[in-house]
Structure formats: structure tokens, C-alpha cells
């Protein structure tokens, strides 16, 4: 998708939840995209960040920006793809200092404003994103096999609000969850 976007003259914003993950992904992307890749995050000095900002405003902006939350605020002249890797991570939430925001939500809004596509990546999507996929608001691509062929978990969405309204819950856990935990423990499995 990144290569296709670049070939069509578009720009890509690739967001990671933590700066520590940047180095690993950067090496892979640098091998493919070379000097078309720009890295942007809060650990860079002010001077380094200003240089990236200036290049984004130039006639030769980066085709791909890889970064953490702060990369959302860079200028893009032709943003066409936004990738939010590990979208479920809580570190996408900016608490302090203000402004407080959720980078995943901000990325979706930025993409909407720019007419860009959004790819939310996660092997364990947030409940919000998974619900949006189940209701058709988002598309869903499922991983059918896991690393070393580990069995995929069965996911069951339970409307606990409805269960509470019908007085079918005595605590914070649904009857289905309690039954599954009891069954796992009875079989000697982890729960």
C-alpha cells in the first residue's frame, strides 16, 4: 500500500505507539524507501524537528513519515494513506501535557480531512475498532493463522448494558465470561 501510494504521488503517515518501536520499523522502511522516509518524534531535538517540518513544506517533502503521536501535526501536501500500527495501544492517548487527544481518533479525522485512506493495524484490535468493523463502519481483514500456528481466540461480543437492564448480571463480568472461566479452570487451563 505504501509503495502504491508513493507511485501515485501521495504521502504516507505511519504512526507507531512508542518511539522505541520506531528503530525496528525504520530499518525495514529505510531499506525499501531510502531517503523518501522521514522520522519524526519528540525525542529529536528542536532543530531536527524543525528541519523535518521545513522539508514537509518544501517542494520535495518526505513521501513517508514514520513517527509517534506528534507526527500527526506535521504539514502534508498530499496525504493519501495513514497507517496506525498497534492501534489498540493506550500510549496513543496523550494525557499530559495538554492538549489531550487520542492519536488514533486524530489520525482518522486527519485522513478524512485530507481524503486519505486509513489502515488500523492490530492483532488485538480495540473494542471500539472491532465494533466498528463488525457494524460495517470499518473494513476488516482477519488474520487466519498466527505465528507458529497458535490457535486464534474466539471473540464473543456481549451487551453487558442489556444484561444489566434485564438483571442478568450480579457483578462486573457477564454470565458467558464467568461460565468460560469456570470451564477453563475445571479443565486445568489458564483463564
Question: Would you name each region that the model predicts?
Answer:
Residues 56-64, 69-119:
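SF2 helicase catalytic motif II
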Residues 5-31, 48:
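Conserved Walker A/P-loop ATP-binding site and its immediately adjacent core
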Residues 106-191:
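Conserved interdomain linker/interface between the two RecA-like ATPase lobes of SF2 helicase motors
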Residues 1-3, 26, 107:
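Motif I (Walker A/P-loop) of helicase-class P-loop NTPases
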Residues 27-65, 73-79:
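Conserved motor-coupling elements within RecA-like helicase/translocase cores
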Residues 22-24, 47-50, 74-75, 90-93, ...:
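Switch/connector loops and helix/strand junctions flanking conserved nucleotide-binding motifs
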Residues 37-46, 89-101, 163-171:
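Flexible beta-alpha connector loops of hexameric P-loop NTPases
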Residues 9-10, 60, 115, 188:
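Glycine-centered short loops/turns at secondary-structure junctions
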Amino acid at each position: 500500500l505504501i509503495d502504491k501510494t508513493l507511485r501515485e504521488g501521495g504521502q504516507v503517515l505511519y504512526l507507531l505507539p512508542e518511539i522505541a518501536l520506531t528503530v525496528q520499523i525504520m530499518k525495514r522502511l529505510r531499506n525499501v524507501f531510502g531517503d523518501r522516509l522521514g522520522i519524526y518524534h519528540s525525542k529529536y531535538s528542536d532543530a531536527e524537528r524543525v528541519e523535518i517540518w521545513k522539508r514537509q513544506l518544501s517542494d520535495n517533502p518526505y513521501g513517508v513519515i514514520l513517527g509517534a503521536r506528534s507526527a500527526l501535526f506535521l504539514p502534508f501536501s498530499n496525504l493519501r494513506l495513514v497507517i496506525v500500527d498497534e492501534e489498540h495501544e493506550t500510549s496513543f492517548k496523550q494525557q499530559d501535557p495538554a492538549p489531550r487527544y487520542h492519536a488514533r481518533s486524530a489520525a482518522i479525522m486527519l485522513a478524512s480531512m485530507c481524503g486519505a485512506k486509513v489502515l488500523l493495524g492490530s492483532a488485538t484490535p480495540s473494542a471500539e475498532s472491532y465494533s466498528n468493523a463488525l457494524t460495517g463502519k470499518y473494513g476488516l481483514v482477519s488474520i487466519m493463522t498466527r505465528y507458529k500456528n497458535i490457535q486464534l481466540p474466539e471473540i464473543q461480543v456481549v451487551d453487558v448494558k442489556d444484561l444489566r437492564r434485564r438483571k442478568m448480571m450480579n457483578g462486573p463480568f457477564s454470565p458467558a465470561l464467568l461460565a468460560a472461566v469456570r470451564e477453563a479452570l475445571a479443565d486445568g487451563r489458564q483463564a
